[in-house]
């Protein structure tokens, strides 16, 4: 029924599956009956039998050391990256139509089911052409989507992989109303989760947004970074303009290069302990397989309490 005064189905069909999928994330997948049944089969095969079930749900004959070439060129679209590193290139995405700048889903690494949460700034079509682009910023919808998925994974003791490529927080009226609480919810979900947590930094990782995305500060067990990643408080050019407001364009360029070398790249972050290892993009799969195998026996002794407040 048209419960909203002045609305009708021709104007805005709020009861449609597409609306519920795209605007509030209540629907994970929209399709025909056969397509939905196939999605359910895939999901059931990837999930443990219960919260104490083994996350090794399948045997793996895929090469654990398989090199993943050309991933760096597609780092804006984590769907491509996740499918490349997963066993047999399998990636099961959840809530694909909702908060498209944050990707969530399940992959397999050596037969182990792993939950993935990733920043998304680009979407490529089947022909490899860029079809859509987003800001590299955190939004309220994206944070809520990530928080809900992390809590789901933790409930089943499914390990979580985050792929970080973010440079700030979304600046809009919606963010002013909702983002602070959404960030708190996502941060709580990461820090409260007792499952294994690994963070992979593929592009930019700037400021508070980077900290929220499963950094060591909120509980990541291991943090890997591609050698070309940029990690710091802010973009080097912006930092140079703030520190040298009277400088000309050439001097700003030089100061930005100096700042990037000292403060705004993966190597200084690794030297300070924020990153455990710098890796080549092609070697991503083998390092992640080894990381989650090492963390398979992770156990957290929690204090007696009821629950958190977020």
Segments the model singles out, each with a brief description of its role:
Residues 1-310:
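Ligand-binding clefts of soluble mixed alpha/beta catalytic domains
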């Amino acid at each position: 029924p048209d419960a909203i005064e002045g609305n009708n189905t021709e104007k805005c069909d709020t009861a449609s599956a597409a609306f519920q999928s795209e605007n509030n994330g209540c629907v994970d997948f929209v399709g025909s009956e056969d397509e939905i049944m196939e999605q359910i089969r895939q999901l059931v095969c990837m999930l443990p039998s219960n919260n104490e079930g083994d996350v090794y749900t399948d045997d793996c004959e895929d090469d654990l050391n398989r090199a993943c070439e050309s991933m760096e060129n597609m780092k804006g679209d984590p769907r491509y990256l996740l499918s490349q590193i997963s066993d047999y290139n399998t990636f099961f995405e959840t809530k694909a139509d909702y908060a498209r700048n944050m990707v969530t889903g399940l992959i397999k690494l050596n037969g182990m089911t792993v939950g993935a949460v990733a920043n998304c700034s680009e979407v490529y079509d089947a022909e490899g052409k860029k079809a859509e682009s987003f800001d590299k910023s955190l939004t309220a919808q994206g944070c809520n989507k990530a928080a809900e998925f992390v809590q789901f994974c933790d409930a089943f003791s499914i390990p979580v992989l985050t792929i970080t490529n973010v440079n700030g927080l979304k600046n809009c009226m919606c963010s002013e109303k909702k983002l602070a609480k959404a960030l708190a919810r996502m941060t709580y979900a990461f820090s409260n989760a007792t499952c294994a947590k690994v963070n992979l930094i593929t592009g930019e990782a700037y400021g508070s947004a980077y900290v929220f995305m499963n950094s060591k500060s909120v509980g990541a067990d291991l943090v890997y970074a591609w050698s070309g990643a940029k990690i710091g408080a802010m973009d080097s050019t912006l930092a140079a303009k703030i520190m040298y407001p009277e400088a000309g364009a050439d001097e700003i360029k030089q100061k930005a290069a100096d700042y990037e070398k000292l403060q705004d790249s993966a190597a200084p972050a690794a030297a300070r302990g924020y990153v455990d290892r710098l890796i080549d993009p092609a070697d991503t799969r083998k390092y992640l397989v080894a990381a989650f195998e090492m963390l398979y026996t992770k156990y957290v002794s929690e204090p007696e309490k009821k629950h958190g407040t977020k």
